[in-house]
From Swiss-Prot:
It is found in: Cell membrane. It comes from Buchnera aphidicola subsp. Acyrthosiphon pisum (strain APS). Keywords: 4Fe-4S, Cell membrane, Iron, Iron-sulfur, Membrane, Metal-binding, NAD, Quinone, Repeat, Translocase, Ubiquinone. It catalyses: a quinone + NADH + 5 H(+)(in) = a quinol + NAD(+) + 4 H(+)(out). One of its GO terms (cellular component) is plasma membrane. This is NADH-quinone oxidoreductase subunit I. NDH-1 is composed of 13 different subunits. Subunits NuoA, H, J, K, L, M, N constitute the membrane sector of the complex. NDH-1 shuttles electrons from NADH, via FMN and iron-sulfur (Fe-S) centers, to quinones in the respiratory chain. The immediate electron acceptor for the enzyme in this species is believed to be ubiquinone. Couples the redox reaction to proton translocation (for every two electrons transferred, four hydrogen ions are translocated across the cytoplasmic membrane), and thus conserves the redox energy in a proton gradient. Transmembrane segments: none annotated. Residues 50-80, 90-119 form the 4Fe-4S ferredoxin-type domain.
Amino acid sequence: MTLKNIIIGFFTQIRSIFMIGANIFSKPETKLYPEEKVYLAPRYRGRIILTRNIDGQERCVACNLCAVVCPVDCISLQKSEKTDGRWYPKFFRINFSRCIFCGLCEEACPTAAIQLMPDFELSDFKRQDLVYEKKDLLISGPGKYPNYDFYNFSGVTLKGKKTGDLEIQARPIDVKDLLP
C-alpha cells in the first residue's frame, strides 16, 4: 500500500462524511405510504367506474365498444333494452386482475360512462374478488363530465321525444342543402 492510496482513501472517507452531513437535514425522499398519501397526477389512470346522467340514469348504452377495444379482454357486458327504447347493460363485468389500466375503454366510450379515477388501491387476497360487477362500478354522480348527456347530443330519438326538440340539441342537418 502506497502513500498515494492512503491519501486517496482518507479523502474519500472525508468526502463521504461531508455528503452525509450536507443531506442530514434535508427532506426524506421515501414516503411512508399508508400514513402519507402519494401525489397522483390529475390524469392518473386508476380504478374504472361507471357514471350516471344528471337525471340519475345509467350513461352506459351497452354499445360494446369498450369490450372490443380492450387489449386484455377484461370487460364483458350484455345489452338489454328498456320500454322507452333506451339500451342499458343487463350485466357489466370488469376483471381487474387482468386489467392493465391503459384507458382505451374510456377513450372508446361514446357516452362518457366509463371513466378512470385516481384510485389504485385494488389489492385483494382472492383473485375472484377482483371481478367487479355493475353494482360495484356504478357511482351515483356524473364523474368528470357532469353536463354531458349522450341522448341529447347524438340525435338518437327516444319514444315520446323528437330529434331536435331539446334545448341543447341542434336540429338535424339536411345534407342536400350543403351541396353547391
